[in-house]
Amino acid sequence: MPYSIMLDAGHGGARDPGAVYNGRREKDDTLKLALGIGEILQNQGIDVEYTRTTDVYETPYEKAMEANEADVDYFVSIHRNSFPTDNQVSGVESLVYDLSGIKYEMAQNINAQLETIGFVNLGVKARPNLVVLKKTKMPAVLVEVGLSLIHI
């Protein structure tokens, strides 16, 4: 039986651009990534839902409740890290509520897969205070993909 996932393009709307680097906004990159990843997953037979498909703002709590109401199997929130200066730091870091269970395995697998295409694996870290990880009922991962200075 196919499973379902909700993809969250981090940030959004006029009030929350996320990280900004030389005019590039995290909210735009995360939306492109979420839509692209969603298309790949749908082509694999996975039921994909999104917290947003346009440039709108929802609070992290609203996103978590949306995922809970949709009764999806998994939740992945996509973000991009930033760095205050030009540098060559790039990688993937995944955040989970705690370092156990399916969510932790998912995060490790996401990082490992991105490592195979050139991302530095910056590890999986527990962030129990993040609302989208704390309030979702299903396994949830927040993925920090690359840096905002790197074009996607």
Question: What kind of feature is each model-predicted range?
Answer:
Residues 2-4, 24, 28-150:
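Active-site-proximal helix/loop segments of hydrolytic enzymes
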Residues 3-23:
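Short glycine-rich His-centered loop
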